[in-house]
Regions:
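Histidine-acidic metal/acid-base catalytic patches
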Residues: 1-67, 72, 83, 134-137, ...
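The substrate-binding groove and active-site-proximal loops of carbohydrate-active enzymes
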Residues: 42, 87-91, 116-119, 147-154, ...
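Catalytic alpha-helical scaffold of carbohydrate-active enzymes acting on polysaccharides/glycoconjugates
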Residues: 57-60, 94-108
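Surface-exposed charge patches
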Residues: 58, 103, 131, 169, ...
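Glycine-rich, proline-tolerant flexible connector loops at the mouths of alpha/beta enzymes
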Residues: 69-100
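Conserved radical SAM core fold
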Residues: 74-77, 146-151, 246-248
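Active-site acidic/histidine proton-transfer and metal-coordination neighborhood
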Residues: 111, 116-210, 300
Length: 314
């Protein structure tokens, strides 16, 4: 960002060069400290007891992370249907609803990045969601997409933008900030050949809606994460990060391997370039999230490897 010309300075940089020097020069008040966070879903396997949770949280802290991002369906008991749906999506919640997350997070010395919720809950009972977020010490509430929603319809997507804008405006009155978290469905084209994520960006006000951009899902959908990060600019205040690749097998039969999330720096996502853009965008927190394919099937060991990669760069 250039204070002299009032425009962002992305452009192409020579090989081996970074956007970081320009970023540093732009900060009159000094270096921005980007916080590093872990999505609570990565700790679901450790939720069998408060003792196990605290042990995992302490390892998160030791790995260089500053905070935890919470999900409303994990911090209190969820219905049977929610547990079934999340498990089917590869996001099992374990016994997390029985744990004292507020007390355990405080004991670990970590803070809370944000609370993931859903638009319906906010529209029906905003005060309750706000109260829960404030209890955990965060002013950020994140909507993680819509279930059974027609993203191919321009009117439906525009309606969603209107609802998000109104909800964000109402949240601001309580000192809260609304975010939208993408997956891959937001790259769906409607009948006007518009992508849903573009519509949400263009038809909402920056004061009412910020974005938690998930570059893993953009890459999975075949899009260019760098271009989307540049397009979002400073409305991208949170960044969901994961690398994408595979684990090599000696007995691989075919020349086609199945991709999945892998530890940061071990896959094929252009993470160094994405990190440079995140710094230009003044991203506030980087949130690590993977659901499976962890090294030795151990999510905490996996986040420790990714934490080392982040610690060396952030």
């Amino acid at each position: 960002w250039s204070h002299c010309c009032g425009q962002k300075q992305y452009g192409e940089t020579p090989k081996g060069k970074s956007l970081l020097p320009r970023f540093l020069c732009a900060r009159r008040e000094g270096l921005i400290m980007i916080k590093k966070s872990v999505q609570l879903l990565m700790l679901s396997k450790a939720s069998k007891s408060d003792e196990k949770v605290l042990e995992a949280l302490m390892r998160v802290k030791a790995a260089g992370f500053d905070s935890i991002e919470l999900n409303s369906f994990m911090v209190h008991p969820s219905s049977f249907m929610v547990r079934v749906l999340t498990k089917a999506a590869g996001m099992g919640v374990g016994s997390s609803g029985k744990r004292d997350w507020k007390g355990l997070i405080e004991k670990s010395g970590l803070s809370v990045t944000s609370l993931h919720s859903d638009l319906g809950s906010l529209e029906r009972n905003m005060d309750s969601v706000v109260e829960e977020a404030k209890m955990f010490g965060t002013n950020r509430i994140v909507i993680t997409g819509m279930y059974r929603y027609d993203y191919t319809s321009s009117s439906s997507v525009s309606s969603l933008a209107t609802r998000l804008n109104k909800c964000g405006e109402n949240l601001r009155k309580s000192g809260m900030e609304l975010f939208y978290h993408n997956h891959n469905i937001e790259l769906t084209l409607d009948e006007k050949r518009r992508r849903a994520l573009d519509v949400l960006l263009l038809e909402t006000d920056k004061e009412n809606l910020s974005f938690e951009l998930d570059t893993y899902w953009l890459g999975e959908a075949g899009a260019d994460p760098k271009e989307w990060m540049k397009k979002m600019g400073e409305r991208m205040k949170l960044w969901h990060i994961a690398d994408r690749g595979w684990r090599s097998k000696k007995d691989q039969i075919t020349p086609i391997v199945e991709c999945d999330s892998v530890e940061l720096g071990t896959g094929n996502m252009p993470l160094e370039e994405l990190l440079d853009i995140a710094k230009v965008n003044r991203v506030e927190e980087i949130v690590l999230e993977t659901h499976k394919n962890w090294i030795n099937n151990d999510p905490v060991a996996s986040l420790e490897i990714s934490g080392k990669w982040l610690k060396e760069r952030v």
